[in-house]
Amino acid sequence: MRSKVIRGGCTNLQQIACRRTLGGMWPYVQFTDTFQVGEDVWGTLDPNALDPAHTGKAAAIYIVPHKTAAQWTADNSLNHLAVLGGNAATQKWITQSWCTNANLHLLWSNASQVGDYDVVVDFGNNSTTLAGFSQDDHYDMPLDIIDGYIVPGFRVVPDPAVDTSFSHVGSFSYTQPSVTVTSDGGSTFTVPITANVRFPADVAGATSASDISAAQSSYPVVVCVHGNSSHTNSFEGYDYLLDHLALNGFIAVSIHMQPGQQGTDRARILQNHLPIIFSLFGAHAANNVGIMGHSRGGEAVVIAARLNQQEGWGWNINAVISLAPTNQYTFENFGGAWARPYLVIYGSLDGDLGGIGDTGFELYDHASGMNKSMAFIYRACHDRFNTVWGDGDFFFGQLTAADQAAVISANSHQLIAKGYMTAFFRQHLKGETQWEGIFRGEWIPASVSASDPGMKIYTQYEDTSVETVDDFEGVHTATSWQSSTIGGAVSQSGLPVTPQENDLRSMDSQSPHLTAGLSLRWDNTTDSLDYSIPAGQRDVSGFQAVSFRVSQRVNSASNPVNQAQDLRLTLTDGGGHSRAIRISKLAEIPYPYVRGVASLVKSAMCTIRIPLAAYHIHCFNVDQVDLTDVTTLSFQFAEKVTGEIEIDSIQFTN
């Protein structure tokens, strides 16, 4: 049985915890293992994974604190959460065979209790009626079903923008002799080695590295590198972020740069600070480092990751964040031996780096070999992430008065920085996997969403475990689009113009991307683009999702103004079974953000991820796709009569 977690074993494991999809339309659910405090936890049983003996049987469903396999063996009793009413209040129903939706129930409204949980379906006395059913309050193998066991079935997690694990922040500053560095342009800068430091403390008022909390033997280190400004105290503009990181168990440092510094010279100053930080904290500072850079600093931290490896600096740089970065000095290809998890954050109303080129889109496109993510934040600007800079980029000529009025608040900017950066560093420096969904675009921290009623964040994401169907790289000709990266034929039906494959910016002057892609337009709901999956590549059952990057094309008359685009992604198997998933039920293909200066509006791609479970869960009167034998992947333009989009990175992925 596909629900048996261990070959030959008797543990029936099935994904149960889920979210309802937008609009409550089929495929109805998106299975997940992470919910924020305040979210609704739904649960369903996929008839495909039910033993025939389970169908049409009464069952009680429990949410219980997670137990390991050994703990379940020692004690298989079930204790439904007290907050849900205990065992007397378990939900009960008759399992259905005809559709996943028929087994869909709200398990926990407004989940309020942070923790790790398992979901257990108890078939009790194996009754076919609720009247005759008696639950036994035990997890009995092989009859009962569990979502959990080896790992938690799901987690309820706090908001990373406000969550803290320590009560106090220690702080001090240091200044050491200046260092002279040479910039990428050949200029020299003499830079005071000055920094602000925050760390977790056990008491208020701690001002020495020796006062670091005794709760842990050592702590990861995060260093922030600011960008260019005439202010000589720019490094102080991230104190709010340092405080939050310290309260989450990091030694957090923001370092000074001189006005006018460029890229590599900023990386050299970072190089000079790291030994000082580790000397101050000794064994309390773990060689487990995250680096964040803003603007020119955002390019500098990518340079630093490369130099650390090439020159043997000796630091374990394990996470890199570029906030509204430049891409103008060394034009990095972040990857290879120095590839590390990477996050880019950038706003649609950046008033300093608002151009089509020289932005984080380019750094993201040229990063490879790591888990990478980019958050494109509608209405965020450049300078409000730094409290010293304030609204400085309002006056650089790239933001109109209407743009300035539309920019989200300084508080929203700070919550974004605290939420996304803390979650990223907690994931990659502390191994806390519960934050992954943020960077796949599955959820936004609640305080971030609540900080502005129109908050929109669109995510690009790429995993290291992928099977690429097409990335559109290589030699481009009029017919090169007809052959995919995976080696299959590509065809179209009904499109009014032949699709064009080329470097995106050569096809669309509004594209911020430095990568190849496909541009296409449709004018009928019967139009399609079809990818043949060659033999030997058709088993995608080991992946979690199918994904692609997509953007509406700026200024295209085919895209309805101020409307999201929509389409269906269809998989077909060797037996001719097909299922089409409507994108708008899982994600959004947004209309390009229109800012006051038309030349700065961007055809910015986001990543659409469709769980492969959506293609094989049981839905009434809809084909189930055999994921071990997928022969065709099709874009079907059946949802909107017209449209023009650019696509890239078609992948089966985790």
Residues covered by each model-derived region:
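Extended, solvent-exposed regions of the mature portions of secreted/cell-surface glycoproteins
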Residues: 2-159
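Extracellular ligand-binding interfaces
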Residues: 69-80, 522-622, 629, 637-654
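Short conserved active-site loop signatures built around small residues
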Residues: 91-92, 141-217
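Gly/Ser-rich "nucleophile elbow"/oxyanion-hole loop immediately N-terminal to the catalytic nucleophile
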Residues: 204-218, 264-295, 311
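Short substrate-entry loop that stabilizes the transition state in hydrolases
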Residues: 204-207, 214-219, 224-262, 351-354
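Primarily recognizes the serine-hydrolase "nucleophile elbow" in alpha/beta-hydrolase
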Residues: 278-336
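Active-site-adjacent alpha-helix of alpha/beta-hydrolase-fold enzymes
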Residues: 337-411
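Alpha/beta-hydrolase-fold serine-hydrolase catalytic core, especially in secreted/extracellular enzymes
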Residues: 379-381, 388-531, 541-547
